[in-house]
A protein has these predicted regions:
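Right-hand nucleic-acid polymerase module
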Residues: 1-75, 86-228
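Cys/His-coordinated zinc-finger cores
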Residues: 79-83
Length: 228
């Protein structure tokens, strides 16, 4: 699985399992407590996860996590994790290797940038710490693994760089991408539509086009909406 595919799949997973109540946590090692090798880091994470699962069970919930290691060229080590909500004080008591940074995840439900960071950290560690390889990220087994529906359009002139956004959805403009597929050799055009949680009446659908010269997304049909 290449980087682009890994980011796309991880984005689907994060979007399907986390929301504004979830947390993005970085567990950092103090300099004198850094792991000597990948096996030691994994052992530390396994101990941490046992504590998290026990704490979540006691609170009446089930831990849902995704984590990746980050090891710098000079040995600085961190563990990055997405986790459903857990009490901050409880979490602090589970990590005795240094300090933790906790950031609430936003309520957008769209975590492509976070997925890209996770894959970047993972690839960085594969280069700086011998022994890390294989998986781009690690996760609990209870996560929802979405499988998006795919439709192949074979009609003539169907591929015209036009995106019609149906009522109740909006276009994630940063997701629009056109490139040559590294395996098939065919050109592909991809984008993400996000379900809009805001209730509003729409008379017309938004239509967007990709400007091939500038690479920018242009609105070709203005949306007409009535606010409640």
């Amino acid at each position: 699985m290449n980087s682009r595919q890994a980011i796309k799949k991880l984005t689907w997973i994060l979007n399907a399992n986390y929301d504004g109540t979830s947390q993005y946590i970085t567990f950092s090692y103090a300099k004198d407590k850094r792991p000597e090798n990948p096996a030691a880091l994994r052992k530390d994470v396994e101990k941490l996860l046992r504590g998290i699962r026990a704490a979540q069970k006691k609170a009446g919930t089930v831990a849902k996590y995704v984590w990746v290691p980050e090891v710098g060229e000079r040995g600085a080590a961190h563990v990055h994790m997405c986790l459903n909500h857990i009490d901050t004080q409880v979490l602090k008591g589970l990590w005795d290797k240094g300090w933790i940074t906790i950031k609430p995840m936003d309520d957008s439900g769209q975590y492509a940038k976070l997925a890209a960071y996770f894959v970047k950290y993972s690839e960085k560690t594969m280069k700086t710490a011998e022994g890390f390889g294989g998986k781009r990220y690690n996760s609990s087994r209870n996560l929802v693994i979405p499988e998006p529906e795919k439709t192949t359009i074979r009609s003539r002139n169907a591929y015209n760089h036009t995106i019609q956004v149906p009522s109740g959805w909006y276009l994630d403009k940063e997701s629009v991408r056109e490139a040559w597929h590294e395996v098939t050799g065919f050109m592909y055009f991809t984008y993400t539509l996000v379900k809009n949680g805001k209730k509003r009446k729409q008379k017309n659908r938004d239509t967007y086009s990709l400007n091939l010269e500038t690479g920018e997304i242009e609105i070709t049909e203005n949306q007409q909406a009535e606010r409640n």
